[in-house]
Amino acid sequence: MRITISGPPGSGTTSLSKHLAAEHNLKLISAGEVFRQLAREKGMDLAAFGELAENDPSIDLMIDARQKQIATEQDDIIVEGRLSGRMVEQADLRIWLNAPLTCRVGRIAFRDSVTCEEEAMTLTREREASEAKRYMMYYQIDISDLSSYHLVLNTERWSVGQLGLIVNCAIAAVRD
């Protein structure tokens, strides 16, 4: 079983991926965690690191190539990342999560300990614009085109556990 979980920042991809990985005993490969770790290692915030990635394609290409490689070599995995649904060609289930911008910004502000939601809003918009530009430039992928996903969920009103129940129905259907 190969599952991809994608979505914009703050939509809950990491939380749901961790939940499902634990529940189904699947290995989790997370592009966002790799990206955040690289930013921390360079002593940069995500917006600044995103700007660096715009000028240094090797950052995105390295993360994406690693996810693609793991997905071709392993089974029983969840690959979480903005482009994982496009990069993992042999995925059994491709999921896209979303939520209204204000909801996502609130989650990001909480997660990243940003006290000013206006600052979080600005950073989120900049990050999303930066990512959309890079994905189009590197891969000719329009991140707003969701046609390759099997399941698209708005996460605003559901807890991680409730989202897990919804996705479990899809997993059961794929396994049958």
Curated annotation (Swiss-Prot):
GO terms for molecular function: ATP binding; CMP kinase activity; dCMP kinase activity. It catalyses: CMP + ATP = CDP + ADP; dCMP + ATP = dCDP + ADP. It is found in: Cytoplasm. Belongs to the cytidylate kinase family. Type 2 subfamily. GO terms for cellular component: cytoplasm. Its EC number is 2.7.4.25. GO terms for biological process: pyrimidine nucleotide metabolic process. ATP binds at G7, P8, P9, G10, S11, G12, T13, T14, S15. Keywords: ATP-binding, Cytoplasm, Kinase, Nucleotide-binding, Transferase. The gene is cmk. This is Cytidylate kinase. The keyword Plastid does not apply. CDD domains: CMPK.
